[in-house]
């Protein structure tokens, strides 16, 4: 079991190495045990991660009980919710790469035999999974848990309620006192943001991927069921180390398709598309936007989840969690049940053993009673997005929108224009130079999209960007436009007053301009001299690829 760690614990030449370990309280028989690393995302930066320390402490004790020498190391986190709408949001997607680097460096640099990664906020999940795949030693992902819903009177709240309250204030639909009440009650506990936003989308999909245990990803952060997941995850990891089951044995093209099927079924975040493109690359597998679109067309939405729907992730957990979702998909032949999981059993065997609760619940619907017949993450292409774009259509009553472009080069100017009433029904807001290189860091545009919803324009105005969207975004939005503006993509050539059509039925994003005029604009285009970054952002800018390939940093 200690195939890797024996390099530092065995033989007389490793006496100095063992001396260092003795200072950490290890001795004698410990040196024959496997070294299991616990990557801890604990942080008091954000409620998403503030409850993780107790998870890490319990996991460390459980692993030791099962015969491991356990070593805890830290992984950083950026709070998307707190950095939203600020220059700090540029570091959010960058942190996915930093987290993966940290995990790979510690696991490989310290000759670990296994890995348990514990995370909470959005980029902890894809960053952790990419790190597990790069290290490719037996590993498992353990989620820190979801936050419980907040309440203001009878109204159920999430953090997105606060963002939308800002827009409501802009149209004088809410008083300052009411906004502050929403602010005070939106986040009542620790845990990741409580709708089917990015963190909960990714954690739910990790169950289908086979890298997290069934029913472990939807449990509220403060709860007994989370403690049970810790125990079973530790036991499963030791078994994987014993049997030599590695992440790349589990994460394959077929299991990634299972994960994306769950993303579609729960009405998940657009970020899942970006992250699974990167996860597939780390797994040495293949996934394209075309694959994502094919999955979308097959898989119905069977959960009416926030942000556009009614239910929180805690509601989904009470209704049977991801196993219940996967059971419904499996009945319709939409899950490949032969895929291996980190337990050593197939996903079909795991589903058979899983306890599925409340079959009468309306939180998870049978596929023949689906909320939508197809997934709501639509891949678009056209003369504005030669390499693709991703639209989220949950909660929309319109699938075709044509309107006049309002072009902005900064999120701040865009939000101010929306709140000042300068964006009207039918407009197409175009936010440019916010892609992987242009941001740099491809920041999320929750503030402008929430402002549109709060101003009553969620169904009647459209927002298009080469940046990203929060999992809390809903409305008529198109992101991940590739090529991005900063590399001369067509989105950089859009001008105020241009006419744009978003056709979700025909997967089209079209700028109404003749080819000659578009070519003339392209010939005249020059990159604006506005980018002035250094350090980590400069390194990211110089090495990052385009969003249609997962925005992977070299």
UniProtKB/Swiss-Prot annotation:
Enzyme class, broadest EC rank: lyase
One of the GO biological process terms: L-valine biosynthetic process
Top-rank taxon: Bacteria
Cofactor: [2Fe-2S] cluster; Mg(2+)
Function: Functions in the biosynthesis of branched-chain amino acids. Catalyzes the dehydration of (2R,3R)-2,3-dihydroxy-3-methylpentanoate (2,3-dihydroxy-3-methylvalerate) into 2-oxo-3-methylpentanoate (2-oxo-3-methylvalerate) and of (2R)-2,3-dihydroxy-3-methylbutanoate (2,3-dihydroxyisovalerate) into 2-oxo-3-methylbutanoate (2-oxoisovalerate), the penultimate precursor to L-isoleucine and L-valine, respectively.
One Pfam family of this chain: ILV_EDD_C
Gene that this polypeptide is encoded by: ilvD
Protein name: Dihydroxy-acid dehydratase
InterPro entries, per database record: DHAD_IlvD/Edd (IPR050165), Dihydro-acid_dehy_C (IPR042096), DihydroxyA_deHydtase (IPR004404), DiOHA_6PGluconate_deHydtase_CS (IPR020558), ILV_EDD_C (IPR056740), ILV_EDD_N (IPR000581), IlvD/EDD_N (IPR037237)
Amino-acid positions noted as binding [2Fe-2S] cluster in the UniProt annotation, renumbered to this chain: 48, 121, 193
Cofactor, how bound (note): Binds 1 [2Fe-2S] cluster per subunit. This cluster acts as a Lewis acid cofactor.
Active-site residue numbers: 470
Keywords: 2Fe-2S, Amino-acid biosynthesis, Branched-chain amino acid biosynthesis, Iron, Iron-sulfur, Lyase, Magnesium, Metal-binding
Reaction(s) this enzyme catalyzes, per UniProt: (2R)-2,3-dihydroxy-3-methylbutanoate = 3-methyl-2-oxobutanoate + H2O; (2R,3R)-2,3-dihydroxy-3-methylpentanoate = (S)-3-methyl-2-oxopentanoate + H2O
PROSITE patterns in the record: ILVD_EDD_1, ILVD_EDD_2
EC number, UniProt record: 4.2.1.9
UniProt GO molecular function: 2 iron, 2 sulfur cluster binding; dihydroxy-acid dehydratase activity; magnesium ion binding
Family: Belongs to the IlvD/Edd family.
Pathway: Amino-acid biosynthesis; L-isoleucine biosynthesis; L-isoleucine from 2-oxobutanoate: step 3/4; Amino-acid biosynthesis; L-valine biosynthesis; L-valine from pyruvate: step 3/4
Subunit details: Homodimer.
Positions bearing N6-carboxylysine: 123
Annotated positions binding Mg(2+): 80, 122-123, 444
């Amino acid at each position: 079991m200690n195939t890797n760690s024996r390099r530092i614990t065995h033989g007389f030449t490793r006496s100095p190495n063992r001396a260092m370990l003795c200072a950490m309280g290890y001795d004698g028989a410990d040196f024959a045990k496997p070294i299991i690393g616990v990557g801890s995302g604990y942080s008091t930066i954000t409620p998403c991660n503030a409850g993780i320390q107790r998870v890490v402490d319990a996991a460390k004790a459980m692993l030791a009980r099962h015969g491991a020498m356990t070593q805890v190391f830290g992984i950083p986190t950026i709070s998307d919710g707190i950095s939203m709408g600020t220059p700090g949001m540029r570091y959010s997607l960058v942190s996915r790469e930093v987290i993966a680097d940290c995990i790979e460096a510690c696991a490989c640099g310290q000759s670990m035999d296994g890995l348990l990664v514990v995370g909470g906020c959005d980029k902890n999940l894809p960053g952790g999974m990419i790190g597990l795949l790069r290290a490719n030693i037996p590993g498992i992902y353990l989620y820190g848990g979801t936050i419980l819903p907040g309440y203001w009177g009878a109204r159920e709240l999430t953090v997105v309620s606060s963002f939308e309250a800002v827009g409501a204030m802009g149209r004088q639909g809410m008083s300052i006192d009411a906004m502050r009440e929403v602010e005070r009650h939106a986040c009542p506990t620790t845990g990741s943001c409580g709708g089917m936003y990015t963190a909960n989308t990714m954690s739910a999909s990790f169950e289908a991927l086979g890298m997290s245990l069934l029913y472990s990803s939807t449990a509220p952060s403060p709860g007994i069921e989370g403690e049970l997941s810790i125990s079973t995850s530790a036991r499963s990891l030791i078994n994987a180390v014993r049997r030599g089951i590695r992440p790349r044995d589990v994460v394959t093209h077929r299991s990634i398709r299972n994960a994306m099927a769950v993303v579609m079924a729960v009405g998940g975040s657009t970020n899942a598309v970006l992250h699974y493109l990167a996860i597939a690359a780390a797994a040495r597998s293949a996934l394209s936007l075309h694959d994502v679109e094919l999955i979308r067309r097959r898989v119905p939405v069977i959960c009416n989840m926030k942000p556009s729907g009614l239910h929180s992730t805690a509601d989904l957990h009470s209704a049977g969690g991801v196993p219940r979702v996967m059971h419904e998909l499996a009945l319709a032949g939409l899950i490949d049940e032969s895929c291996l999981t980190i337990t050593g059993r197939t996903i079909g065997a795991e589903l058979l053993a899983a306890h599925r609760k409340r079959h009468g619940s309306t939180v998870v619907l049978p596929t023949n009673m689906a909320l939508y017949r197809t997934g709501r993450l639509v891949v678009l292409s056209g003369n504005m997005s030669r390499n693709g774009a991703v639209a989220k259509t949950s909660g929309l009553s319109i699938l075709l929108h044509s309107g006049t472009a309002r072009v902005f080069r900064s999120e701040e100017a865009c939000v101010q224009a929306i709140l000042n009433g300068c964006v009207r029904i039918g407009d197409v807001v175009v936010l440019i130079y916010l892609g992987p290189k242009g941001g740099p860091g491809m920041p999320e545009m929750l503030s402008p999209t929430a402002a549109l919803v709060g101003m009553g324009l969620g169904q009647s105005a459209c927002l298009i960007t080469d940046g990203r969207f929060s999992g809390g975004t809903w409305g008529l939005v198109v992101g991940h436009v590739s090529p991005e503006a900063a590399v001369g993509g067509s989105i950089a050539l859009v001008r105020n007053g241009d006419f744009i059509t978003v056709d979700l039925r025909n997967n089209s994003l079209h700028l109404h301009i003749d080819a000659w005029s578009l070519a003339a604009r392209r010939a005249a285009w020059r990159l604006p001299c506005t980018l002035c970054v250094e350090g980590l952002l400069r390194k990211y800018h110089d090495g990052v690829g385009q969003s249609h390939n997962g925005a992977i940093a070299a």
